[in-house]
Amino acid sequence: MPTLSETTCVLPYHAPVPLTSLPLVFHRDHLFPYTSYGDTLGTPVSREFRLLVLENDAVKVTVCPDLGGRVMSYIDKTTAKELLFSNPVVKPVRILPVWAFISGGIEFNFPIAHSPTSIDTVGSSTGKAATPDGEYAYIRVGEREARSGMEWVVELGLLENSPVLVQRTALRNDTARAHPWMMWTNCAVPSTPETEFIYPAGPALRHDRAVGDITWPCDGSDWEKNITQMTGFFWKPGSGHTFGIWHHDTGGGLLHLADPAQVPGKKLWTYGFGADRSWALASTDGLAGYSEIQSGPLEDQGQKPLFPAGGELRFEEYWMPAATRGDFARAELPAFHLPGWQAQTPWLGHAHSSWQCGWESFRCGHGPMPSSIVPPGLELEDALRAAGAAESLALWLIARDRAAEALPLVEALASPTAQRLAGLICWKTLDDPARAAAHLRRGPLHDPIAVVELDQVLSVLQLTDERRSLLESAPPHGCVIERRAHLYLTEDRPAGTLRLLRDTVWPLEHQRYVRGTLWHKASLALGLDPAIPACLGEDALATFGEYWSD
């Protein structure tokens, strides 16, 4: 009989540090209304996490609602082997969209990858059901997403005596607007030089320092030891129903199975065995490397279509241990007789979120207006207008693509944060940098983000002297230093750009090309090799994917 239980674990936790307290609207590489992070503390603290445990005679599955609902562990009890990369630390690193990605386990990402709540608590529930195959026990995790109001739920289930982990996903948009979306399940697995990646032979897309089509396997890339740089692969639709990994050194592996008509997306991501391996180690405190095998209902992560208003999507997939290398050729889709997924009402809403609950209580007239950032996924316009909350209403309108309506609300306010919003609207929506600068000069210039925004507008206006004065008096934050490097280029001082970039200690930041672009331009101006050095902390991946907020 499958069992359900609840427990806790204590892990070393490196707390992420917010980039700013300002709402990051009109920033492509940040996801309003979520907090973006600019640093992670080097010294961990012990933190307790709530766990839900699903177990039968064959396997034990552990889920952590406090870390985005991820599967933390999947143990094959017949061999006592951990099938996942189960990270022994929680250490966020700088990866889109909120710059606080944590590695390990099976992560669920909707409506963008990576999930903006991967280090936050999501909703959860448990249950059991009788089936012709025996008792079925499940854990459900999910939430109503604060940006769009769309919802996701993943059900993770076991039948008695079966090692197969059932994963059933439900997505819906019960708002009045269509929203961009993607949904990817990201499974972290251990990787060594003897790890073989087993995917369908045939056409695939490879993403490394270039983006191009290949025929898999190509150049030995089905073995981890042959990949020398961070690389992603996406398989074309119509390929087979299985993929996974086999560890030749330890004699074990993990299979993923799905009907490609429901779940066509297949991805492999690896940092390889080369200089990029340090990126994998950054989120593990240097303890271990990993790769990622991913699945989803879209073909690749360059796709972010609109999820229609009132729409719903449900699909099923499965994970199972591989006892031999031959299991990959023999594996068939399970034919379980589970409770009909289409008939379930699995939604978990936002009851888990004190942030959203506070605003919903305010909306219904049951509580005061919270001091937190307004979540645009909730229908708050009437309540905000009734409360006379002009600045919060302006933020809500901006997030709803109604920035022109927000402008008179904040132009009339004297507060620096309201003036900043007015300036951003004039710049990003009205394309009026002179009017924008007038507002941004009255913004909260103690904050490096506000300094950068004003400097970008001054650059458009070619006000170099004012830029120099602004940046020289600003705190030496990383994003301010980048703007100083940009100013040196504007002043035809490319050697100063290179020196400033080279002499600053930078964090690793994935798919952020600011410093590399500056280095490239300055090097070309001096007739030097424009190759991007690793000390800049930016990867050399070609631009690809829809991981940004626009």
Where are these regions (language model features)?
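A contiguous, surface-exposed recognition patch within enzymatic or periplasmic domains that forms
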Residues: P2-H14, L52, D66-S73, K77, ...
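Acidic-aromatic substrate-binding/catalytic surfaces of carbohydrate-active enzymes
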Residues: P2-V25, L31, F49-T121, W269-Y271
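Long, contiguous interaction/recruitment modules in multidomain scaffold/adaptor proteins
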Residues: G286-I293, P305, F315-R385, A403
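Alpha-helical repeat scaffolds
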Residues: L338-G349, S353, P375-L384, R402-A412, ...
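"A position-specific structural signal for the A-helix of alpha-solenoid helical repeats
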Residues: S392, L421, E453-Q456, R483-H486, ...
